[in-house]
Amino acid sequence: MKSFKDIFDQYQWDDVKERLEKVTLNDVEKSLQKKNKTIEDFLNFISPVASQKLETMAKMAQSLTQKRFGKTIQLYAPLYLSNECQNICTYCGFSLDNLIRRKTLSDTELMMEAAVLKSMSVNHVLLVSGEANKTVGIEYFLNAVRLLKSHFANISIEVQPLSEEEYRKLHEAGVNAVLVYQETYHQEVYKQYHPKGKKSNFDFRLETPDRIGSAGIHKIGLGVLLGLEDWRIDSFFNALHIDYLQKNYWKSKYSVSFPRLRPAEGFIEPNFIMEDKDLLQLICAYRIWNEDLEISISTRENEKFRNHIISLGATTMSAASKTNPGGYSVDKESLEQFETSDERSMDEIKNMIKKSGYDPVMKDWDSVYSGI
């Protein structure tokens, strides 16, 4: 079986840029009319000229989403385990070179955080950590999952890339989904954003979803950090990656997230500004291209945008998020990974969803379905 690296190496960044610029309105219209969409159709949907068809794309995305997922929005909350990190990433508040107080939750603190989330009726929790293998490695994660398993129906993780064996252990412990972001697929500049630490290894990170799929994880989540490089080109490669994974690890489900670069301690300014209309175009493009793909919108986005996107392709949202370890109860002043934009409570988010004519879903999965 070809690895994604084999496929990735067949493409050049500048060639994809040129192809995007050459797309015509007729190309977009033909792609919209096709029954079975390909990665080439996705490229047409995210092209600059496709913005002229945004209204048509939005209506199509709305119809396809309701047909596949109904009028529901799944809700989750992140639980940050640690802000310790061995990497230097020029855009992240947890970066090793930021001289800030580091914190890793103890078992007692972890359960205090969990209790607050349970009081908000949260049943899907996303465990997040900086990348520090000695402090927060596989044994720490396994312990956290075991402690939380009886309290939450759905546990996802977003941590450093691990080995296939380690992902198998997490799956057996009760992890339902793993999220991993390449940040950017622009290999030539990747090192500039990640000058030190294991994250500087572009290929190892690129091959992580293969290891997740081989381990039998139920759901794999991908995304890029929008704002580092040209969002259209990065998104093409991200979709290419999802396309490859679905063909080779077809038993797994897939989701895509859209983190836009947000203010953080020691942050850099975005190299490429992504306007709301651009993000809307991208979300619609993903939905029209792939009807089964889960689309997740975090509290990085503002209230107005999140209210609007509910009916146009989103299937999953975070709510009441704290992006620092202990942020819900233990240590509310510890360093955040990034600033949130939508600071509404869980109840406020649920009420907003209901007013939009949709149903907020707090539980959509249980580990019993995996035989765990």
Model-derived segments and spans:
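Auxiliary Fe-S-binding modules of radical SAM enzymes
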Residues: 1-50, 118, 247-372
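Short, charged low-complexity linear segments at domain edges
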Residues: 53-74
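Conserved, mostly hydrophobic/aromatic
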Residues: 61, 89, 180, 212, ...
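Canonical Radical SAM [4Fe-4S] cluster-binding loop centered on the CxxxCxxC motif
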Residues: 69-109
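Generic structural signal for well-ordered alpha-helices
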Residues: 77, 114, 141-145, 167, ...
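Active-site-proximal loop/turn and secondary-structure-junction residues that shape catalytic pockets
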Residues: 79-81, 131-133, 159-163, 184-186, ...
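Core AdoMet radical
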Residues: 96-112, 117-212, 218-222, 226, ...
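Catalytic cores of alpha/beta
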Residues: 164-172, 229-243, 302-312
